[in-house]
Regions:
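Flexible, surface-exposed loop/linker segments and immediately adjacent secondary-structure boundaries
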Residues: 1-27, 31-200
């Protein structure tokens, strides 16, 4: 892993303002303030400084993937080439697919997030994995579309939550839901994904 273009040393800490790059087979786990991050292999991102050295204001993911848990605090953002998410206090997974014109995948694993892509914008409220695609080109007239849960696990979120003395929504409620990307712990009639409400 590299920090600001230099190989990360075992005794080095990651701070806001740093740029991070991981190579093949590398995984990087770190904490900044009340937020924790697991950066996957072949990823490029930066953590931009908020009001203090220990507050992340923007996580900018240029490529690859990151799982993150965010404590309560001032409004923060995750920015990818095709999607922006306004974070309140939540656990999320974000991935940029370079081979698909930087198509971005975003899962609000639990919590409340404002998600936008192009002119499409929704508020996601999830107890259990509500997922989206930020499309590089409109699909059926939309740049924000629904997705299934992919490429991350409950256990990753639980581990990151423990690092910042938190518990996931499903740990608090004592049950797990259906991993269909809709965001609900129980499948009930009439439940809709937020993208189904766009244009209504």
């Amino acid at each position: 892993a590299q920090i600001n273009g230099t190989r990360l040393r075992p005794d080095q800490t990651i701070q806001t303002g740093d740029s991070i790059a991981t190579g093949a087979g590398a995984t990087l786990i770190f904490v900044v303030g009340n937020s924790s991050f697991k950066v996957r292999q072949n990823s490029r991102m930066s953590v931009e400084r908020g009001g203090t050295l220990r507050t992340v204001s923007i996580l900018r993911l240029l490529g690859g993937a990151v799982v993150s848990v965010w404590g309560q605090g001032p409004r923060r953002q995750i920015v990818t080439p095709t999607l922006t998410a306004g974070i309140r206090g939540t656990g999320v997974y974000t991935e940029v697919f370079a081979a698909q014109n930087d198509r971005s995948y975003f899962c609000n694993c639990y919590g409340t997030v404002d998600v936008s892509s192009g002119s499409d914008q929704v508020t996601s409220r999830a107890d259990y994995h509500q997922a989206f695609w930020g499309e590089p080109q409109p699909r059926n007239g939309r740049t924000l579309t629904s997705a299934n849960m992919i490429n991350h696990s409950d256990e990753e979120l639980e581990m990151l939550a423990r690092l910042v003395a938190q518990r996931t929504a499903w740990q608090v409620m004592g049950k797990r839901g259906v991993k269909d990307g809709k965001g609900y712990l129980e499948d009930k009639p009439g439940q809709m994904h937020p993208t189904q409400m766009l244009g209504k």
